[in-house]
Amino acid sequence: MLKIYKTSTVEKKTKKVKKMTTDCWIDLIVPTTDEIDKVATRTGVDKNLILKLLDTDELPRVEQEDNATLIVIDIPYLEEKAEHKYKTYPLGIIITNNNYIITVSVKKTTMLNDFKRNIVKDFRTAKKTRFLIQILLKSASSYLKALKEVNNDIEAKEKVLKKSTENKDLV
């Protein structure tokens, strides 16, 4: 899925737009080959760079490419029905030299929704460094929320174990 956002300089509101223009944010969520080709052609980013970001095992890092900077972070998500509820997946952030910012993810993330809904204070698609820092802050907040939930789960299980007197309950 390809979505494009741009902050209006007059209204200072971020809106979904149809065309990729400078100072826009291109959000790719499990993109098709056609969407990757379209973004690569318009922005000048190597499509193999985007394709690499679709690997769920991609490691966090920062790389300087010919015409872009790549930042890969892991962001947490909750998978209720899995054995381990909390998992992470990579979010790729590409900041191009020709004023585009591209986010690439292998799953639909709620973490970026506040940017799309104009909830994040002082968010501007033209302010690439600020946007990056705001994404990192949102990611850190997501980890703190997940950590709090893990701690609550641990405390609840410790209470159950404390009340338990039979060995079968300990297994």
Language model features with spans:
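Extended amphipathic alpha-helical scaffolding segments in membrane-proximal extra-membrane regions
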Residues: D74-L78, K85-V171
